[in-house]
């Protein structure tokens, strides 16, 4: 069983926790449709980097 030898300092604890923050998604505007979307993701209309890559099928 692992048992620590020394108590971690407040500084070391803070350094460990510094990467636990929640990141906010970056948004961008599509060149063609003008939609706001998350970076590196498709828009709702199927555009990616200004090109139509996904066609919606009507049911």
Swiss-Prot record:
The SS bond pairs are none
Enumerate the PANTHER family for this protein.
Answer: 50S RIBOSOMAL PROTEIN L32, LARGE RIBOSOMAL SUBUNIT PROTEIN BL32
Q: Name one GO cellular component term.
A: large ribosomal subunit
The molecular function GO annotations come to: structural constituent of ribosome
Q: Which Pfam families match?
A: Ribosomal_L32p
- List the InterPro entries hit by this protein, alphabetically: Ribosomal_bL32, Ribosomal_bL32_bact, Ribosomal_zn-bd
User: Region Disordered: which residues?
Assistant: 1-20
- What is the native source organism of this protein? Wigglesworthia glossinidia brevipalpis
Per the UniProt entry, the signal peptide is none
- Kindly give the HAMAP family that the UniProt entry links to this protein: Ribosomal_bL32 (MF_00340)
Protein name stated in the entry: Large ribosomal subunit protein bL32
Picking any one GO biological process from the record gives:
translation
Q: Report the family membership.
A: Belongs to the bacterial ribosomal protein bL32 family.
For the keyword Ligase, the answer is: no
- Residue spans of biased composition, Basic residues class: 7-19
- Keywords for this entry? Ribonucleoprotein, Ribosomal protein
């Amino acid at each position: 069983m692992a048992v620590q030898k020394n108590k971690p300092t407040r500084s070391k604890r803070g350094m460990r926790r510094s990467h636990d923050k929640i990141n906010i998604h970056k948004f961008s505007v599509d060149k063609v449709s003008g939609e706001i979307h998350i970076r590196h993701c498709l828009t709702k209309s199927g555009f990616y980097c200004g090109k139509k890559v996904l066609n919606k099928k009507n049911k």
